Amino acid sequence: MPSTDLKKQADAAVESDVNTNNEAVESSTKEESSNTPSTETQPEKKAEEPEAAAEPSESTSTPTNASSVATPSGTAPTSASLYVGELDPSVTEAMLFELFNSIGPVASIRVCRDAVTRRSLGYAYVNFHNMEDGEKALDELNYTLIKGRPCRIMWSQRDPSLRKMGTGNVFIKNLDPAIDNKALHDTFSAFGKILSCKVAVDELGNAKGYGFVHFDSVESANAAIEHVNGMLLNDKKVYVGHHVSRRERQSKVEALKANFTNVYIKNLDTEITEQEFSDLFGQFGEITSLSLVKDQNDKPRGFGFVNYANHECAQKAVDELNDKEYKGKKLYVGRAQKKHEREEELRKRYEQMKLEKMNKYQGVNLFIKNLQDEVDDERLKAEFSAFGTITSAKIMTDEQGKSKGFGFVCYTTPEEANKAVTEMNQRMLAGKPLYVALAQRKEVRRSQLEAQIQARNQFRLQQQVAAAAGIPAVQYGATGPLIYGPGGYPIPAAVNGRGMPMVPGHNGPMPMYPGMPTQFPAGGPAPGYPGMNARGPVPAQGRPMMMPGSVPSAGPAEAEAVPAVPGMPERFTAADLAAVPEESRKQVLGELLYPKVFVREEKLSGKITGMLLEMPNSELLELLEDDSALNERVNEAIGVLQEFVDQEPGFTE
């Protein structure tokens, strides 16, 4: 373990120092043995910068005995509330309760989650009834493995003014990847009481090579800097210094930019000599150093650096030589930048270009899918050219040049694009109904999908609570009585597909179309699905089956029973769907899908059918034809339902 070696190195450094520093360490050690708690806050969720970046855990400390620490850096915690970070997303309140309740009675636990997706944010708050239990948990459970990850525990600090005080905060960089939070804590604990300790990691959990240690006093921080700065930790020389806030660092960078003396030159002729290089830039002022970068064969690589004695000379060289030709090549001459500066500028430039591109095509770029393989760019452009001027039309293809079944059409104005969406969505092209909509960025689509999932989960939960209380499920719009399928489960057309509102103006059941069933024959099996009514007969005359403890639906009028249809259509094509009014297509598809879903998953057939009905009509038609695809979608829906059940404690299907 790296922590043992690091601890030994730190201890050796302390032993070799003078008595003054030893006293500082002793006073810090005394504090560690006391029961005085420290205060800490949750980490900032911003991305950390590699060079003295914004601290991931800005914190405050508690006042201690004046004899040991002259200047306290914060105030004691006012409640027995602990922050628990670095948690696996699957960690729940129950898991944390089992761990922390072993220390003492827990008042409450809250895992913080995203407001939309309800996914864990990776941290939680644990509240004890008394401070002693909080102190004990902090001492005994810090860095305990929870689902394979070491947790990080600190006192919770809600006051932002205290949270952003950097007193006693130390920044360490050039760390070996093997050094983790615990190893860093063990190394620096020799210099004083540590309030928080964190090694920065990327999205995959790999160490970024830098971290932060927050001491409870400036003296402890100074001792750590004096002893460890420049030391070899795991054979790597580390830098240790006081943490500098991002705002301060940025102001220093701006000052350096305004008074730069170091100049970077590229696009130099590869035959240039050092004397020619010196003569070229020496005419603008005194040069303190210059470097013409060469390869292993001692041949110039085409770039170099010149450092002037003052800023005016450097600025003059940039003004005079930038974009000027020298030996047949146009030079680039500018202020020398560090790597992270260049990367930041490139990132900002890329984001700006991306934003401009998005704004340019906002509202004029269309996404078209469900295209036949034979439809090419020219055919796509011809079909959509009637609605305005097209700047581009592209079918997306794979590596072999085969169509992926979707493409994009870009117009010059939003009005043209909206007209095309209105006219072409669901229109038949080469035997398939098109899906046409405004193109959206992946992030927007993902956020919309997450919002839909959240709304759906909340609606299901409301239905479950209402059912448990004996309250009938809410129906949007003035619908007639529920029509039930085999086994007493509602047919989606009658409940509008999992609570989806009916189209305004259509208050009754959907109109009949040739060959379209509206309910299964009373008392008998569904046509083509023998034995599906094993749970009991469907009520005759289209009356809704009343479940125990439920009350009748409060619809404005009783809908007439729709006569049963003798058989299911063998094949329902896109042309058949096109003949159905648009507002009723979902209901038609729902009645066709429900028996197929019922065979695969009887208990959840109504919910799953409602979930499937949120798909585009073209994809629903494919599910009717392709049993394997339908099986896959049903399994996905069951997985979503199961995930929701797992995430909601006490919730049962």
Swiss-Prot record:
Residues 80-158, 168-245, 261-338, 364-441 form the RRM domain. Keywords: Cytoplasm, mRNA processing, mRNA transport, Nucleus, Phosphoprotein, Repeat, RNA-binding, Translation regulation, Transport. Residues 53-68 have a biased composition (Low complexity). The modification Phosphothreonine is found at residue 167. GO terms for molecular function: mRNA 3'-UTR binding; poly(A) binding; poly(U) RNA binding. The keyword Transcription regulation does not apply. PROSITE patterns: PABC, RRM. GO terms for biological process: mRNA 3'-end processing; mRNA transport; nuclear-transcribed mRNA poly(A) tail shortening; regulation of nuclear-transcribed mRNA poly(A) tail shortening; regulation of translation. NCBIfam families: PABP-1234 (TIGR01628). Binds the poly(A) tail of mRNA. Appears to be an important mediator of the multiple roles of the poly(A) tail in mRNA biogenesis, stability and translation. In the nucleus, involved in both mRNA cleavage and polyadenylation. Is also required for efficient mRNA export to the cytoplasm. Acts in concert with a poly(A)-specific nuclease (PAN) to affect poly(A) tail shortening, which may occur concomitantly with either nucleocytoplasmic mRNA transport or translational initiation. Interacts with cid13. This is Polyadenylate-binding protein, cytoplasmic and nuclear. It comes from Schizosaccharomyces pombe (strain 972 / ATCC 24843). The lineage of its organism: Eukaryota, Fungi, Dikarya, Ascomycota, Taphrinomycotina.
